[in-house]
From Swiss-Prot:
GO cellular component: bacterial nucleoid; cytoplasm
Gene Ontology molecular function, alphabetical: double-stranded DNA binding; single-stranded RNA binding
Organism: Pseudomonas paraeruginosa (strain DSM 24068 / PA7)
Keyword terms of this UniProt record: Cytoplasm
Top-level taxon of origin: Bacteria
PANTHER family, sorted: NUCLEOID-ASSOCIATED PROTEIN YEJK, PTHR38772
Family membership noted in the UniProt record: Belongs to the YejK family.
Main location class: cytoplasm
Xref: InterPro entries: Nucleoid_associated_NdpA
Keyword match Metal-binding: no
Name of this chain's protein: Nucleoid-associated protein PSPA7_4451
Pfam families with a match to the protein in the record: NA37 (PF04245)
Length: 340
């Protein structure tokens, strides 16, 4: 993961309305194993977070970041100058947000594979302990990436090469209420373009419809479910979206376009690339059971809605039966009535 440029600035601010103080670095960080380790750990922590996805607002006085980034990429300003202008803008937005707290702000332009990224993160320290060379226990401060709450990553290559894309920016969703992280999103100038949970739910609905339409055996349906969930989870782990054509090929290498064509023909309105939402995925794994001529299999997210479990009576109540099953039951009932 080659790091092209990296720098850290410091903004001191408490969430009490006091002015923010900026301590800006005037030179890039040199190449070192430490900065490589930091960026690797940052990416690992960032990829594990729930994120929103979007694109740049139109450049304006309120959203100047994309213009500064474009100038840097065109060579009209250097990386230090770009980061300095950006962090001064962030300082102003922090002062307008009483709930915000300061920290070290990392800017890193790096390459992963053939793709260029810009990572921006607000880093905080935690107090710990260490054992020194004299074997004494001493206080120790370290960057606490487990407490990463404000960070964004811009896919520079996607932004520059795909003008229609609406998901080349990702940023961590704030847990402490929307207003806590709004200023950071406004700093980037990001407009949400893809609702990751909604897109993931729509994809899973399309998959369930596809499985039903193909009248798949239980084992085959289970295998395809695992393929979908494993692929989506692996993409979420590395911070990359799912692509419908790749997913379709993984699900059936004999008919690699089958699922993709089904989605397109049914017009689910899905984007070609979908950022996976891990919470939605975790609700999708299947419950299965087989005994004495009875076989039951259903997706976990249906429990509590279409399927209700009564532990005391040891029963399942199913509503909105699959069309094929309903038709079979109706035919059987009609046959019984005609012979009675």
């Amino acid at each position: 993961m080659p790091i092209k440029h990296a720098i850290v600035h410091l903004i001191e601010k408490k969430p009490d309305g006091t002015p923010a103080m900026l301590h800006a670095r005037d030179a890039e960080l040199g190449d070192s194993q430490a900065i490589e380790n930091l960026l690797a750990d940052l990416n690992e922590s960032y990829n594990a977070k729930n994120k929103a996805w979007g694109f740049f607002q139109g450049e304006s006085g309120a959203y100047p970041f994309s213009g500064w980034l474009g100038d840097y990429l065109e060579g009209d300003r250097d990386f230090v100058g770009f980061s300095r202008e950006a962090v001064e803008h962030l300082q102003k937005l922090m002062e307008e947000s009483n709930l915000s707290t300061g920290g070290h702000i990392l800017f890193a332009h790096y390459q992963q594979g053939m793709t260029d990224y810009l990572a921006i993160a607000l880093l905080h320290h935690s107090e710990g302990v260490a054992v020194n060379e004299s074997l004494e226990v001493t206080p120790s401060r370290h960057l606490d990436l487990a407490q990463l709450h404000l960070a964004a990553r811009i896919n520079i290559s996607e932004w520059r090469n795909n003008k229609q894309s609406k998901q080349y920016i990702s940023f961590i969703k704030g847990k402490g209420g929307k207003k806590v992280s709004d200023y950071f999103r406004d700093f980037i100038g990001c407009q949400e373009g893809v609702d990751s949970p909604s897109e993931t739910r729509t994809l899973l609905k399309a998959f369930s419809d596809f499985v039903e339409s193909e009248d798949m055996a239980e084992e085959q349906a289970r295998e395809k479910t695992e393929t979908l969930v494993d692929y989506a989870t692996s993409q979420a782990r590395i911070g990359e979206p799912m692509t419908l054509d790749a997913l379709s090929e993984l699900m059936d290498d004999q008919q690699p376009r089958a699922f993709y064509d089904y989605i397109r023909n049914k017009d689910y309105g899905l984007s070609p690339e979908i950022p996976a939402d891990k919470r939605t995925l975790n609700q999708f794994r299947r419950f299965t059971g087989r005994a004495e001529g009875l076989s039951i299999s259903f997706e976990a997210h249906l429990l509590g809605s279409r399927i209700e479990y009564d532990e005391e009576r040891d029963t399942l109540r199913i509503s909105s039966l699959p069309t094929q099953l309903r038709d079979q039951l109706k035919r059987r009932k009609a046959e019984q009535e005609s012979t009675s």
